[in-house]
């Protein structure tokens, strides 16, 4: 499971469809669908139940979304903190 896959998964949840997520992520739908299938395969669960009106999260999907959102937020804040720390200059005396 990669952060990129979690970003894709969250985008699908937040836009309500694979096609909407593909537009939001500026990518085509087939690679996004492929990554979703890879994630489901790796986790051995269905994350969405496909209905005539689109996709609905399964119980496993809801749990993953909660955890993925937290992980992505944490990764983003960590990246910002590390970047800011790297920008600080150290003044050495002596």
Where in the sequence are the language-model features?
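Interdomain hinge and pocket-entrance segments immediately C-terminal to HTH DNA-binding domains
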Residues: 83-94
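Helix-turn-helix DNA-binding elements, focusing on the entry/boundary residues of the two helices
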Residues: 17-18, 36, 50
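Core residues of bacterial helix-turn-helix
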Residues: 24-25, 36, 43, 64
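Short helix-boundary/capping micro-motifs
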Residues: 12-28
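Short alpha-helical "packing" element that flanks the helix-turn-helix/winged-helix DNA-binding module
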Residues: 8-12, 64
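A short LG(V/I)-centered, amphipathic sequence patch enriched
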Residues: 40-57
């Amino acid at each position: 499971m990669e952060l990129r896959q979690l970003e894709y998964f969250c985008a699908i949840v937040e836009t309500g469809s694979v096609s909407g997520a593909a537009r939001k992520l500026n990518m085509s739908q087939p690679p996004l669908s492929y990554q979703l299938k890879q994630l489901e395969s790796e986790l051995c669960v269905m994350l969405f139940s496909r209905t005539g009106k689109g996709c609905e999260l399964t119980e496993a999907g809801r749990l993953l979304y909660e955890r993925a959102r937290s992980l992505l937020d944490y990764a983003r804040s960590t990246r910002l903190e590390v970047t800011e720390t790297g920008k600080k200059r150290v003044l050495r005396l002596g």
